Every structure is written in structure tokens, then in C-alpha cells.
């Protein structure tokens, strides 16, 4: 089995965290993001105060209010969540391009070949958590392990706002005590069947031969045999093509005016050009853009087709973006949209010359 370094990052009650960040009045009271109880709405997520009452995701809003009469249910703002997710992925890409998103708030990262912190996956995970908290003012939990199966379990081990590491030497002991209900792919039906067979932990599961498990559970028995031993060879898949490359910085002190923002442009562009230089040849830089997040977390993005990637072009874009808010700035970003040359080539291949 190849030795890999996998991080699973999971935002803590993501939608609710964004709502509490943007409206501090929601913090400290039971709240949820979801649909109206009058229209058969469903809870998308809730904060930990609401979970203490038994409120859970996918529960009907009406039932949630019965459990917690003081529950405040707010409508989802998916664009705000998507934007936060994009910011988190921008942070991820500083450490690796091998990112497999599972949802807006959850992803696997393969940092096996990362040079950051001398290749320490634990320190990379710590840095990601620190940067997300500093930049987005929300918390994430992370798990570090030699494979995806264990990394996902690890990220849940010390939720919320926790980090748990399973080293290769700890795998056998850790997995042996693991309840089989925690195994990837084991739902209620399979868990109940395992219990009836007297299999409650992975140590019990190891007593069964591979053949016996296949006879009892079909092809899934093969996977159960491997998981009971901490084996999971699934790779971190990143099939999506990049749409842009960018760099951004959150400042410790808000930038008070346009002049102070413009003064930060050269260093941002230097970092952007370094990142562009590291891209593979299947991409070509296209439209430049700037991103401005104001002190109240409102934000805007300005881009222009046909503009250059020189300092003056970005100065003009930044001036237009700043004018939309005219308030102190907490974050500046610069980037460029990408043209996928590989995709264009493959599309042409579908229609060869006659």
C-alpha cells in the first residue's frame, strides 16, 4: 500500500456559520438555515445550540420547531456560501492541486508531494485551519491520515474546530477499536446485519475471512475486509478544470481608502505572476479581475475582457471595484480567468476534417 498524506477538511455547520458571521445577532442562540415550516421546508443545517435540542439536517422545519420552539430559521443564501467555498478552495490551492470537493463545505486534499512545512501534513492542516479562521471568520475541522477513509473519520473526531491525526503507525490500533457503523459505505441496514452477526468493531470484523465476507455481503464484503484493516486505495480525484488563478490577502488592519489599496497591488501581482508561471501549458491566461471585500464583508468583483495583465490595467479595475463600495477594505484579490486549451483541442477532435 502506497504511503500517502491525505487531509479531509470539513467546515463546522457551514451555512449557519456564514449566517452567524454576517449577522452577529444570530450567534449564541439556536438557529438553522432552511425552508419555511409553513411550506414543508427542510433544515439544511443548524448551529450547535440548535443541535443540543435534537435539531438535525434534513429534518422538517416543522418538526425542528417542535423540538426547539425558540429556533430561528433563516432562508439560505447560496451565493454567499458558494463565495465562501471559493475562498476556502483558494487557500487549499496554495498547498496542492489535488483537491476533491465533496460539497461546498467539505473536501479531500492529497498533500503527499507538497513542499510546504517540509511535507508535514499536520502543519499544513493547522495552517489551513488558521487561515480560514482569519480570512473568513468561521471554523473548520480537519483530519490527517494515510487514506481518505481514515482522514474523513479523523476530521469528525474532534468536531467542532478540531484537528485529529492518525499516523501510519497508529492505523492498526485505531481501526481495531472502530465501530463498524463508522465504516465508509456502511448504512443502517448493513450495520444492523453486522450487529446480528456479532460484528460490532473492526477487530470483530477481522475475524472473518475475505471469502466469508463476500459470501455474506457480496462485492461489498471485499471492501469491508480492507476497511477493517485500514486499507483504502481510493485516490483523491480532481477531474474539474480550473477556471481561474488568483491570489488574495486579508489585512490585519482595514485599508482605509483607494490609495492604500493601490499601494498593495504590486506585491499581489508579483505573487499572481509567480502562480501563473507554475501552471501547466493546457491553460492560457485570459480576462484579468480584481476582488474587493469591504470591512462589513460585502464584496465585489470586477473583470474586463480584452484588458491587459499589466499594473495599470489592474489599477483601473481596482478603482472601479472600490467605487462600488467606497468603504474600508479588509481583503484584496487579483486574478485572471483561464482558457482551457486542452478542452478546446478535445472538442476539435470530435469533428475531424473530412
UniProtKB/Swiss-Prot annotation:
> Where does the source fall among the domains of life?
Bacteria
Under Gene Ontology molecular function, one entry of this record is: DNA-directed DNA polymerase activity
* Residues in coiled coil: none
Active-site feature positions = 106
Q: Name the positions where Mg(2+) binds.
A: 10, 105
> E.C. number, please?
2.7.7.7
- In chain numbering, where does the site feature Substrate discrimination fall? 15
Q: How is the cofactor bound?
A: Binds 2 magnesium ions per subunit.
| UmuC domain boundaries | 6-187
Chemical reaction(s) catalysed: DNA(n) + a 2'-deoxyribonucleoside 5'-triphosphate = DNA(n+1) + diphosphate
Q: Which GO terms describe its cellular component?
A: cytosol
Compartments, record wording: Cytoplasm
Entry-linked SUPFAM superfamilies: DNA/RNA polymerases, Lesion bypass DNA polymerase (Y-family), little finger domain
Record flagged with keyword Transferase: yes
Tell me the disulfide pairings in this chain.
none
Q: Does the keyword Nucleotide-binding apply?
A: no
- Which Pfam families does the record associate with it? IMS, IMS_C, IMS_HHH_1
> Which CDD domains does UniProt cross-reference here?
PolY_Pol_IV_kappa
Keywords from the named record: Cytoplasm, DNA damage, DNA repair, DNA replication, DNA-binding, DNA-directed DNA polymerase, Magnesium, Metal-binding, Mutator protein, Nucleotidyltransferase, Transferase
Q: What does this protein do?
A: Poorly processive, error-prone DNA polymerase involved in untargeted mutagenesis. Copies undamaged DNA at stalled replication forks, which arise in vivo from mismatched or misaligned primer ends. These misaligned primers can be extended by PolIV. Exhibits no 3'-5' exonuclease (proofreading) activity. May be involved in translesional synthesis, in conjunction with the beta clamp from PolIII.
Which HAMAP family does UniProt cross-reference here?
Answer: DNApol_IV
Q: Its quaternary structure?
A: Monomer.
So what family is this one in? Belongs to the DNA polymerase type-Y family.
Q: What is this protein called?
A: DNA polymerase IV
